[in-house]
């Protein structure tokens, strides 16, 4: 595996010189400062690449930009409405410009409106580390009380709504603010931030789109860009839905093995691949990640290794230590290494980029302003644990 680390650009509290010390060779980053849906021009790509590559002397480790995560797909493309044709043209140009700069692995998602979702950004564990958590009743409270979505009763039972209102009433103002911030797009990986009115407006735009419609929109999008992926040998990799539930009543179409089967049936080619995110897929206990790797290993172009612990009788979960959760990380890594050996035997590029996905906020990072889920020390700890498994298995 090629060991990589997520970096959010010059404003990230974690600096390139810090990341150089954690034991990786690759950087995973995105041009978040470019307006949502607009073209990533050559100048901006080169500018970011220069920062990543820069060293003070020949003795320093030179990092490289390994993965673009994410190249955001505009919601007009996902809904196939508005200016979707314009945004597809912008997207094509971005793909070509990244490829010309030797950035060939590109991650994306097709989640409507909101990217990955958590309701608690400061969930304290027994050891006083801080983790991210998803609480389904808090999600219900957000929809019913804050957004005032009229059809929320179609997704939640009367009992759940009553309980959600009770929970919300007991929440501190700071907790309510944190809930709003998270669910309005306040997490760093989200492509866009919304006001309450904007989010309600955007939800209404998607109201007529069902699961089949969104699948078709993904297919039509891939048909448009696949010739570029193939010509430029781009390893395109869709990220699973996180969590793998419909959010705000909007469909999600990359939540399970059946969805991966559909994706890979559109173009049975490695350029049309997946991001294996163990943390996202494992939220649904019906997802057998080991079987997914065995069946769709050749389509894995990028890896996020993260662990979670599910509540037994609800949709709640929190992000656990990388080696302590519902994901059998040893078995997962064993299967990934097996897939890499298969590629090597077939004389194909075999080093799949992997990053430790999220990390607990620990030690000195608790006294700093950090990006939720992206504590430098927490991710470094997770990376060290994962490297230990890789070393032992090799």
Label each PLM-derived region with a short phrase.
Residues 1-4, 9-11, 17-23, 76-104, ...:
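Histidine-acidic metal/acid-base catalytic patches
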Residues 66, 70, 104-107, 111-114:
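Transmembrane-helix bundle segments that line or gate the permeation/cavity pathway
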Residues 30-47:
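Glycine-rich, proline-tolerant flexible connector loops at the mouths of alpha/beta enzymes
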Residues 121-214:
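Extended, charge-rich helix/loop segments that form flexible
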Residues 19-34:
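Basic, amphipathic N-terminal segments that precede the first structured/catalytic domain
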Residues 52-55, 59-64:
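Asp-box/BNR beta-propeller blade signature and adjacent active/binding-site loops
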Residues 21-25, 62-78:
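A short glycine/small-residue-enriched secondary-structure motif
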């Amino acid at each position: 595996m090629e060991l990589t680390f997520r970096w959010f650009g010059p404003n990230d509290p974690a600096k390139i010189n810090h990341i150089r010390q954690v034991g990786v060779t690759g950087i995973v980053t995105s041009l978040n400062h470019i307006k949502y849906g607009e073209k990533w021009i050559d100048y901006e790509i080169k500018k970011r690449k220069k920062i990543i590559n820069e060293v003070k002397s020949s003795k320093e480790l030179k990092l490289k930009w390994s993965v673009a995560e994410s190249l955001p797909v505009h919601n007009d493309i996902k809904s196939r409405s508005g200016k979707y044709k314009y945004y597809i043209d912008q997207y094509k140009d971005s793909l070509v410009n990244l490829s010309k700069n030797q950035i060939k692995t590109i991650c994306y998602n097709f989640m409507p409106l909101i990217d990955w979702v958590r309701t608690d950004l400061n969930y304290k564990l027994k050891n006083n580390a801080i983790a991210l958590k998803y609480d389904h009743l808090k999600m219900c409270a957000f929809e019913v009380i804050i957004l005032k979505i009229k059809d929320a009763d179609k997704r939640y039972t009367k009992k759940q709504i009553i309980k959600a209102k009770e929970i919300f009433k007991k929440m501190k103002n700071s907790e309510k603010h944190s809930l709003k911030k998270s669910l309005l797009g306040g997490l760093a990986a989200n492509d866009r931030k919304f006001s309450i009115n904007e989010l309600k407006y955007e939800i209404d735009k998607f109201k007529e789109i069902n699961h089949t419609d969104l699948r078709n929109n993904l297919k039509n999008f891939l048909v448009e860009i696949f010739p570029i992926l193939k010509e430029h040998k781009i390893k395109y990799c869709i990220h699973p839905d996180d969590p793998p539930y419909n959010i705000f009543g909007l469909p999600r179409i990359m939540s399970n093995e059946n969805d991966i089967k559909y994706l890979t049936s559109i173009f049975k080619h490695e350029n049309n691949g997946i991001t294996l995110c163990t943390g996202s897929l494992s939220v649904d206990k019906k997802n057998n990640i080991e079987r997914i790797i065995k069946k769709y290993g050749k389509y894995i172009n990028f890896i996020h290794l993260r662990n979670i612990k599910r509540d037994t009788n609800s949709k709640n979960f929190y992000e656990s230590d990388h080696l302590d959760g519902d994901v059998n990380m040893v078995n997962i890594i064993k299967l990934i290494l097996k897939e890499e050996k298969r590629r090597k035997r077939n004389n194909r590029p075999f080093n799949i980029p992997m990053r430790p996905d999220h990390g607990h906020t620990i030690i000195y990072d608790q006294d700093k302003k950090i990006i939720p889920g992206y504590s430098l020390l927490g991710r470094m700890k997770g990376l060290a644990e994962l490297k230990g498994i890789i070393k032992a298995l090799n």
